[in-house]
C-alpha cells in the first residue's frame, strides 16, 4: 500500500513537473509576455484572490508592464504601465478593439445588441453615433442641464430632511437613486424611483441586482466548457433580472409610440431615438433602443454613484481637503447654494478633487476586457489570437514612477497639471481610451462635480457614530465597479 502510494505520488509530481516544463518551453517558443508559471487545469487563477486589480499589480512588479497569465482556459494579457496602455489602446487600438464577453451578458443575448459588447463594425458605429449625438453631445447635454439641476436639488432636499432627524445618509445609495432618476428623466421624462416611497423600489433593486451578479467571479468565464451547466446560476439569475428590466422598458416604449400617434411630443432622448428608428430603421430599431436603455441604466448609475461615494469618503477622511473645497465654493458661489454646471469653470479645486478621486479609485479598475481577433505583436511579444486583454488602470494611477506620493489624496497635484481624463494622457485613463472610450464621459464630468460641490456647499458632514476621520474604512470591493467594501454613512448638518 505504501509502495503504491509512493508510486502514485511520484507519478503525480512527475506529471506536474513535465506539464510545467512543457508549458515553460511552449511560452518561450511563442514569445508570450512573461508571467507566473501556471498550474495544471486552473492556470494562474489561484493568484487572483478577491481583489484581482491588487494581485495583478503586485505580479506586474515582478513580471513587467505587459504580462501573460493563464486563467483557466483563457490566455490573458495584463497591461500595467501608461506606455503599454498607449500601445494597446491608441497605437494598435483596432487590433485590440473587440470585447471579451462575460457569460452573464449572454442573458437575453444582450451582447448581440449592446454598444458596449458589439464588435467594432457598421452596427456598432451606427449605435455609437446615435448615442453620442442624441444623449452625450454638448448641445444635448446643454439642453438637459435643467433636468440635472432639478435632480441635484432633490438630492439636497433628501439630505436636508435626513439632517432634521439626525439620520445618517447612505451616500452611495442616495447618489445611486439620483443617477437613476437623472437617466430616467433624460430618457423617458419621468422618475423611475422615489426617495420617499417604495413604489419604484423593485426597479431600483433590479438594477442593483444586475450589478451585483455582473460583478461576481464566474467560473464559466474561465472555463467556457461549463457554459451549458452555468454552475453558479449567474446567467440564469441575470436572465430573470434582464427580462424584467427589458419588459419595463418595452412598456415605456410602447406607451410612447401610442403618444406619438396622438401627436404628443416630449422632446426627450426616447422621442429622438424613436424618430430616428422610423426614418433610418437600418441604423437603429426598437430592440436596439430597448437594449441601449439597459446599457445606460446599468453602466451609468453605478459608476456615478460609486465615484461620488469615494469622493465624499476621501473628503471625510481628509477634513483639510473638505475645508479647502468648501472655502472655494463659499468664495465663488456663496455658502449654502447648489452648484450649477456653469459654475464649474470657476471651481478648479473641486474639479481637481474629482480627478484625484478617479485617479485613486477608477470606477472600472481593469477597464472592460478587450479581446484579440488575430495574433498581435506588442513590443516584441506575441499576443495570441482570442487572448483576453486587461488594462490595470488602478495600478497605472498609483504608479510611483508617475505620481509623487501616489496613495495620498491630494487634489492640488492637478492645479498646475495639464493632464486630462479624456483618453489622451495615459497616466490617467479612468474612462478608457481609443474608439472604445466610455461614451458617458461628457455627462460624468458635468454630473459628478455638481453633485459633490452641492453636497459640500449645502452641509457640513461627519461620520456616523462619531467615527474619527483617520478610522474611516477605505477598503475596496471588486466587482463591476470598484465600490467601498463598507458603505459610507454620514450625517449632514445644513450650512
Swiss-Prot record:
GO cellular component: endoplasmic reticulum membrane
Cellular location(s): Endoplasmic reticulum membrane
Pfam families: p450
Job of this protein: Hydroxylase involved in the biosynthesis of hydroxygeraniol, a precursor of the iridoid monoterpenoid swertiamarin.
Keyword Iron on entry: yes
Domain of life, source organism: Eukaryota
Gene induction: Up-regulated by methyl jasmonate treatment.
Cofactor(s), names only, from the UniProt record: heme
Residue stretches spanning the membrane: 5-25
Main location (coarse class): endoplasmic reticulum
Tissue occurrence: Expressed in leaves, stems and roots.
Annotated family: Belongs to the cytochrome P450 family.
Gene field: CYP76B10
Keywords: Endoplasmic reticulum, Heme, Iron, Membrane, Metal-binding, Monooxygenase, NADP, Oxidoreductase, Transmembrane, Transmembrane helix
GO biological process terms held by the UniProt record: monoterpenoid biosynthetic process
Reaction catalysis annotation: (2E)-geraniol + reduced [NADPH--hemoprotein reductase] + O2 = (6E)-8-hydroxygeraniol + oxidized [NADPH--hemoprotein reductase] + H2O + H(+)
Membrane topology classification: Single-pass membrane protein
Other observations noted: The recommended numbering of geraniol gives (6E)-8-hydroxygeraniol as the product rather than 10-hydroxygeraniol as used in most publications.
Protein name listed in UniProt: Geraniol 8-hydroxylase
Amino acid at each position: 500500500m505504501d509502495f503504491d502510494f509512493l508510486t502514485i505520488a511520484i507519478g503525480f509530481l512527475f506529471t506536474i513537473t513535465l506539464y510545467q516544463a512543457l508549458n515553460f518551453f511552449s511560452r518561450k517558443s511563442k514569445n508570450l509576455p512573461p508571467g507566473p508559471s501556471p498550474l495544471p487545469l486552473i492556470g494562474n487563477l489561484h493568484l487572483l484572490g478577491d481583489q484581482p486589480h491588487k494581485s495583478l499589480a503586485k505580479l506586474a512588479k515582478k513580471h513587467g508592464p505587459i504580462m501573460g497569465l493563464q486563467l483557466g482556459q483563457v490566455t490573458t494579457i495584463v497591461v500595467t504601465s501608461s506606455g503599454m496602455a498607449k500601445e494597446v489602446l491608441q497605437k494598435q487600438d483596432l487590433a485590440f478593439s473587440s470585447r471579451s464577453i462575460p457569460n452573464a451578458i449572454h442573458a437575453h443575448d444582450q451582447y448581440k445588441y449592446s454598444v458596449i459588447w458589439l464588435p467594432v463594425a457598421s452596427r456598432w458605429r451606427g449605435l455609437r453615433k446615435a448615442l453620442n449625438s442624441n444623449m452625450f453631445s454638448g448641445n444635448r447635454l446643454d439642453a438637459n442641464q435643467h433636468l440635472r439641476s432639478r435632480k441635484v436639488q432633490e438630492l439636497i432636499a433628501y439630505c436636508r430632511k435626513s439632517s432634521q432627524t439626525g439620520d445618517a445618509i447612505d451616500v452611495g445609495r442616495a447618489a445611486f437613486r439620483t443617477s437613476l432618476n437623472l437617466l430616467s428623466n433624460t430618457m423617458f421624462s419621468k422618475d423611475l424611483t422615489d426617495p420617499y416611497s417604495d413604489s419604484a423600489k423593485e426597479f431600483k433593486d433590479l438594477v442593483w441586482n444586475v450589478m451585483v451578479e455582473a460583478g461576481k467571479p464566474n467560473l464559466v468565464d474561465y472555463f467556457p466548457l461549463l457554459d451549458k451547466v452555468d454552475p453558479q446560476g449567474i446567467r440564469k439569475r441575470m436572465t430573470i433580472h434582464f427580462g424584467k428590466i427589458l419588459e419595463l422598458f418595452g412598456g415605456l416604449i410602447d406607451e410612447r409610440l401610442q403618444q406619438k400617434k396622438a401627436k404628443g411630443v416630449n422632446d426627450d432622448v426616447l422621442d429622438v431615438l424613436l424618430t430616428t428608428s422610423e426614418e433610418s430603421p437600418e441604423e437603429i430599431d426598437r430592440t436596439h433602443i430597448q437594449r441601449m436603455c439597459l446599457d445606460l441604466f446599468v453602466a451609468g448609475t453605478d459608476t456615478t454613484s460609486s465615484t461620488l461615494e469615494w469622493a465624499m469618503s476621501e473628503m471625510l477622511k481628509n477634513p483639510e481637503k473638505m475645508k479647502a473645497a468648501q472655502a472655494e465654493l463659499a468664495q465663488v458661489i456663496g455658502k449654502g447654494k447648489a452648484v450649477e454646471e456653469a459654475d464649474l469653470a470657476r471651481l478648479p479645486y473641486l474639479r481637481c478633487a474629482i480627478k484625484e478621486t478617479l485617479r485613486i479609485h477608477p470606477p472600472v479598475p481593469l477597464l472592460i476586457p478587450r479581446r484579440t481577433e488575430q495574433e498581435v505583436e506588442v513590443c516584441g511579444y506575441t499576443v495570441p489570437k482570442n487572448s483576453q486583454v486587461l488594462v490595470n488602470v488602478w495600478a497605472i494611477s498609483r504608479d510611483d514612477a508617475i505620481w509623487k506620493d501616489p496613495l495620498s489624496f491630494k487634489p492640488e497635484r492637478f492645479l498646475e497639471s495639464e493632464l486630462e481624463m479624456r483618453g489622451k494622457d495615459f497616466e490617467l485613463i479612468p474612462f478608457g481610451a481609443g474608439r472604445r472610450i466610455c461614451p458617458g464621459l461628457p455627462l460624468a464630468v458635468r454630473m459628478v462635480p455638481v453633485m459633490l460641490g452641492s453636497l459640500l456647499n449645502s452641509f457640513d458632514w461627519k461620520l456616523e457614530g462619531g467615527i474619527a476621520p483617520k478610522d474611516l474604512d477605505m477598503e475596496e470591493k471588486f466587482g463591476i465597479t470598484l465600490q467601498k467594501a463598507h458603505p459610507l454613512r454620514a450625517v449632514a448638518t445644513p450650512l
